[in-house]
Curated annotation (Swiss-Prot):
Pathway: Cofactor biosynthesis; phylloquinone biosynthesis; Quinol/quinone metabolism; 1,4-dihydroxy-2-naphthoate biosynthesis; 1,4-dihydroxy-2-naphthoate from chorismate: step 7/7. Its EC number is 3.1.2.28. This is 1,4-dihydroxy-2-naphthoyl-CoA hydrolase. InterPro entries: 4-hydroxybenzoyl-CoA_TE, DHNA_CoA_hydrolase, HotDog_dom_sf. It is an enzyme of class 3 (hydrolase). SUPFAM superfamilies: Thioesterase/thiol ester dehydrase-isomerase (SSF54637). Pfam families: 4HBT_2 (PF13279). It comes from Nostoc punctiforme (strain ATCC 29133 / PCC 73102). It catalyses: 1,4-dihydroxy-2-naphthoyl-CoA + H2O = 1,4-dihydroxy-2-naphthoate + CoA + H(+). Gene3D superfamilies: Hotdog Thioesterase (3.10.129.10). GO terms for biological process: phylloquinone biosynthetic process. The lineage of its organism: Bacteria, Bacillati, Cyanobacteriota, Cyanophyceae, Nostocales. Belongs to the 4-hydroxybenzoyl-CoA thioesterase family. DHNA-CoA hydrolase subfamily. It comes from the Bacteria. Catalyzes the hydrolysis of 1,4-dihydroxy-2-naphthoyl-CoA (DHNA-CoA) to 1,4-dihydroxy-2-naphthoate (DHNA), a reaction involved in phylloquinone (vitamin K1) biosynthesis.
Length: 148
């Protein structure tokens, strides 16, 4: 099963039209990413303040399928996937009452924080990717059996 994160849309997330401001969807997705790391026993303080390695987002996109309003109960599902020795990508699906309202992608590259050059993903991230991949594949197999 993919990792899931529950979040309620707050007033501060919205714009003058009363819907979630477009850039805030990526912030909400990043919250889900952080929760998934923490759920895998990755220390967030160490992860984000490690002086030797960083994971900048080099690509991000969001498709908005329906508006999200204050008070909406969001369920964010994420599936991270390794796409090279130094890169990974996370796909997000945001739903409200089982209706998909947005889909997003973030691509991350592992770099040496001093030289800013690419480097291989550390073992803890490879393990996080592998665990989430297995969980997502297992959920997909269960779903396909239910359809048959």
């Amino acid at each position: 099963m993919s990792f899931t994160y529950n979040r309620t849309v707050r007033f501060q997330d919205t714009d003058a039209a009363g819907v979630v401001y477009f850039a805030n969807v990526l912030g909400i997705c990043h919250e889900a990413y952080e929760e998934s790391l923490e759920a895998s026993s990755i220390n967030l303080k160490d992860f984000f303040t490690n002086p030797s390695v960083a994971f900048p987002i080099v690509h991000a996109s969001v498709d908005f399928l329906r508006p999200m309003f204050v008070g909406d109960k969001l369920l964010i599902s994420l599936i991270p996937q390794k796409i090279g020795v130094e890169k990974f990508e996370i796909t997000y699906e945001v739903t409200v009452a089982e209706v998909v309202v947005a889909k997003a992608i973030t691509r991350h590259v592992c770099i040496d924080a001093s030289s800013r050059s690419k480097q291989e993903l550390p073992d803890e991230i490879v393990q996080w990717l592998e665990t989430n991949r297995r969980d997502a594949e297992g959920a997909e197999r269960r779903r396909s059996r239910e359809i048959m």
